[in-house]
Curated annotation (Swiss-Prot):
Residues 1-49, 198-253, 270-289 are annotated as: Disordered. It comes from the Eukaryota. Residues 32-46, 206-220, 242-253 have a biased composition (Polar residues). This is Homeobox protein DLX-5. GO terms for biological process: anatomical structure formation involved in morphogenesis; axon guidance; axonogenesis; BMP signaling pathway; bone morphogenesis; cell population proliferation; ear development; embryonic limb morphogenesis. InterPro entries: Distal-less_Homeobox_TF, Distal-less_N, HD, HD_metazoa, Homeobox_CS, Homeodomain-like_sf, HTH_motif. GO terms for cellular component: chromatin; cytoplasm; nucleoplasm; nucleus. Pfam families: DLL_N, Homeodomain.
Length: 289
């Protein structure tokens, strides 16, 4: 037991304890395989040098560019005496990774601000809750003056539909907007159609609608004279028309009896018979000859 232990102890060298892990150069050189740990040589450091010294193993002489690709990254290896050497690491900003990120990041932050601006400009309509249901608040109704209503009514009697120039002219003359005039005509037409559908006579066709000062009573007689004067003149063609002693009020009541037959009897009872007044007038006219 002691003899075997003594034979293997000298194979372990003090320089091998300085490298805690085997270098990659030892794994790439199959010619240096040994039962003990491999030794570091000067040729191992030349493989990772920036100048690209003579490589070993299966690496070709033209593979010196692989060593240059490792320059920007930090790499640490152990030399012959166990001293550590390495290359300084470069930041990500040197390779241009940070600038595109900030460029797109700034654009991403600007896009929501641009889209949110039009949303603030659009004003939402006022909504009021009625019986637990949302309802939009309607605009107040337009109150027309009597002058405006009379002018609109007269124009509606002429034509129920207005052209665009006519509507603009009428709205300007009345101090209204074209929309208000259009809505008034639409409402008026729908009202007329509804009345005619129900069979009622629209107020526009009544005599009082065209002229508010018109009278619905029958026309009065043109000449204020009694009806019997024509008979007295027929008997005496050469006689002058006599002057009537009957008052205009009595003659009007007598003529109105024909308009109201029900009241004719009551009127005739209060008036004297026409022959009693006309007979002395005829005798007086005959004395002129």
């Amino acid at each position: 037991m002691t003899g075997v232990f003594d034979r293997r102890v000298p194979s372990i060298r003090s320089g091998d304890f300085q490298a805690p892990f085997p270098t990659s150069a030892a794994m790439h050189h199959p010619s240096q395989e040994s039962p003990t740990l491999p030794e570091s040589s000067a040729t191992d450091s030349d493989y990772y040098s920036p100048a690209g010294a003579a490589p070993h193993g299966y690496c070709s002489p033209t593979s010196a560019s692989y060593g240059k690709a490792l320059n920007p990254y930090q790499y640490q290896y152990h030399g012959v005496n166990g001293s550590a050497a390495g290359y300084p690491a470069k930041a990500y900003a040197d390779y241009g990774y940070a600038s595109p990120y900030h460029q797109y990041g700034g654009a991403y932050n600007r896009v929501p601000s641009a889209t949110s601006q039009p949303e603030k400009e659009v004003a939402e309509p006022e909504v009021r809750m009625v019986n637990g249901k949302p309802k939009k608040v309607r605009k107040p109704r337009t109150i027309y003056s009597s002058f405006q209503l009379a002018a609109l009514q007269r124009r509606f009697q002429k034509t129920q539909y207005l052209a665009l120039p006519e509507r603009a002219e009428l709205a300007a003359s009345l101090g209204l907007t074209q929309t208000q005039v259009k809505i008034w005509f639409q409402n008026k037409r729908s009202k007329i159609k509804k009345i005619m559908k129900n069979g009622e006579m629209p107020p526009e066709h009544s005599p009082s609608s065209s002229d508010p000062m018109a009278c619905n009573s029958p026309q009065s007689p043109a000449v204020w004279e009694p009806q019997g004067s024509s008979r007295s003149l027929s008997h005496h063609p050469h006689a002058h028309p006599p002057t009537s002693n009957q008052s205009p009020a009595s003659s009007y009541l007598e003529n109105s009896a024909s308009w109201y037959p029900s009241a004719a009897s009551s009127i005739n009872s209060h008036l004297p018979p026409p022959g009693s007044l006309q007979h002395p007038l005829a005798l007086a006219s005959g004395t002129l000859y």
